[in-house]
Amino acid sequence: MLTSSKLLAHSMWLEKTGYGYDLSYGEKGSVDLYNPERVSTILGYNSKKETTDIHILRYTLEDKKGLARIYTKENYSLLYAELDNKYWFNTKDEKWHNVPAGSDIKNIVEEGQSYKSTKHIVKWEKYMLNPIGQKVEIVPLQNPTSLKEGDFLEVQLYIDGKLMPAKEARIAMNSNPYIDHELTYLETNKNIKIKISKSGLQLVNAKYKQKVDDKKVVWYSFTLTFNTK
């Protein structure tokens, strides 16, 4: 492992409710409103890894912001959600601008498309030891739902079904969703061990910056969530 950097950008996860799941967006356990129209996909995987597109209910509360929600009684083993976070510019004054590509922005350091995604394990199946076919994924190398507080979960990061290059990949080494994480830059995409928090919701948080050219990049923020007893 190399240096660390603060988790500044928000992450995404599926939060169980009495009727299904809310797609939550925030940090340290607090939830912020977002534009639900940016939620592109929510999929359900059964025990045989067969997928179903789940109908997304989008609620707008104020200033185009709200949340996305699913109602489901299906016995899914895994849920996956994806949000298109649109185009961003980072400028020399350390400000971020969420405006369309080609906008008249001065003093650009980096610019590019941003995506957020999350996988939630409802019921453990062996196929979850491998990528499920999404763009970026955190893959557990054992059943994480059987772990206890203080145990370590070994994971690997994937992009396009292949091991992600360690360069520009970061991950939080603790699965507690209610604390301010440090994201650790990886030296290698092997032996990544995440410390399990107290029983309940666990959130493994990772980010990856894929270079396009000298200034253009694609940012990926992706999580793996599950519950422990």
Where are these regions (language model features)?
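Beta-strand-rich domain onsets/edges
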Residues: 9-20, 91, 96-153, 158-166, ...
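Exposed beta-strand face motif in extracellular beta-rich ectodomains
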Residues: 75-79, 200-204
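Short amphipathic beta-strand segments in non-cytosolic proteins
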Residues: 43-51, 168-186
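Glycine-centered loop-to-beta-strand initiation motif
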Residues: 62-66, 180-200
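Residue-level recognition of secondary-structure-to-loop junctions
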Residues: 71-73, 196
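Start-of-domain marker
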Residues: 8-69
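Short acidic/polar inter-strand loop motif in beta-rich domains
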Residues: 83-92, 210-216
